[in-house]
Amino acid sequence: MVWSRGQRRKMAQENPKMHNSEISKALGADWKLLSDAQKRPFIDEAKRLRAVHMKD
């Protein structure tokens, strides 16, 4: 997920003892709190990257 890459890095730096599974759960909860408008740029970028990958 495009959004989670940056967020995961930030959360891991802020919480170095947090396990990856806990980070994933927290990121999932945070993603659900975003509005559709906030999610849109990340969804669009994921679609673009998918299209580029399929083209190769």
Swiss-Prot record:
The keyword Glycosyltransferase does not apply. Keywords: Activator, DNA-binding, Nucleus, Transcription, Transcription regulation. It is found in: Nucleus. SUPFAM superfamilies: HMG-box. It comes from the Eukaryota. GO terms for biological process: brain development; negative regulation of transcription by RNA polymerase II; neuron differentiation. One of its GO terms (molecular function) is DNA-binding transcription activator activity, RNA polymerase II-specific. It holds the Pfam family HMG_box. Residues 1-56 bind DNA. Its main location: nucleus. The keyword RNA-binding does not apply. One of its GO terms (cellular component) is nucleus. Residues 1-22 are annotated as: Disordered. Transcriptional activator. PANTHER family: SOX TRANSCRIPTION FACTOR, TRANSCRIPTION FACTOR SOX-2. This is Transcription factor SOX-1. It comes from Pleurodeles waltl. The gene is SOX1.
